[in-house]
From Swiss-Prot:
The [ST]-Q motif constitutes a recognition sequence for kinases from the PI3/PI4-kinase family. GO terms for cellular component: centrosome; chromosome; nucleosome; nucleus. Residues 1-22, 123-142 are annotated as: Disordered. Its main location: nucleus. The modification Phosphoserine is found at S2, S139. This is Histone H2AX. Disulfide bonds: none annotated. The keyword DNA repair applies. Phosphorylated. Phosphorylation of Ser-139 (H2AX139ph) occurs in response to DNA double strand breaks (DSBs) generated by exogenous genotoxic agents, by stalled replication forks and by meiotic recombination events. Phosphorylation is dependent on the DNA damage checkpoint kinases ATR and ATM, spreads on either side of a detected DSB site and may mark the surrounding chromatin for recruitment of proteins required for DNA damage signaling and repair. Widespread phosphorylation may also serve to amplify the damage signal or aid repair of persistent lesions. Monoubiquitination of Lys-120 (H2AXK119ub) by ring1 and rnf2/ring2 complex gives a specific tag for epigenetic transcriptional repression. Following DNA double-strand breaks (DSBs), it is ubiquitinated through 'Lys-63' linkage of ubiquitin moieties by the E2 ligase ube2n and the E3 ligases rnf8 and rnf168, leading to the recruitment of repair proteins to sites of DNA damage. GO terms for molecular function: DNA binding; protein heterodimerization activity; structural constituent of chromatin. It is found in: Nucleus; Chromosome. It comes from Danio rerio (Zebrafish). Coiled coil: none annotated.
Length: 142
């Protein structure tokens, strides 16, 4: 006989994604397709999408970890854009990488210039007894 047919044939192995082979969560196949369709180069090597997916996954995990810490510090269980902003701007390297990026609904970092803070005159206030109350501060309170 010719040897063709359904009997005795080798069973096809279960398909394994390139992401699972590389131990990644990010889609290597999709990154490869986007690299080809994006006209970045005439040809795209097999290792390039794996490397790029790994880098993207690492950066995402780093930002999400810091944002999760910021959410926990604010006693929240859900990460909002404000937490992403705090995470990125408080980290020196991520702030440099994403310096030109605006995060919608992120707000700004709380910051008061030292010049604008009231003067600390603990010695002068204690020595001059002009005030009627003991230890009253000279700062304005409304």
């Amino acid at each position: 006989m010719s040897g063709r047919g359904k009997t005795g044939g080798k069973a096809r192995a279960k398909a394994k994604t390139r992401s699972s082979r590389a131990g990644l969560q990010f889609p290597v196949g999709r990154v490869h397709r986007l690299l080809r369709k994006g006209n970045y180069a005439e040809r795209v090597g097999a290792g390039a999408p794996v490397y790029l997916a790994a880098v993207l996954e690492y950066l995402t995990a780093e930002i999400l970890e810091l944002a999760g810490n910021a959410a926990r510090d604010n006693k929240k269980t859900r990460i909002i854009p404000r937490h992403l902003q705090l995470a990125v701007r408080n980290d020196e390297e991520l702030n440099k990488l994403l310096g030109g990026v605006t995060i919608a609904q992120g707000g700004v970092l709380p910051n008061i210039q030292a010049v604008l803070l009231p003067k600390k005159t603990g010695q002068a206030a204690a020595s001059s007894g002009k005030s009627g109350k003991k230890g009253s501060s000279q700062s304005q309170e409304y």
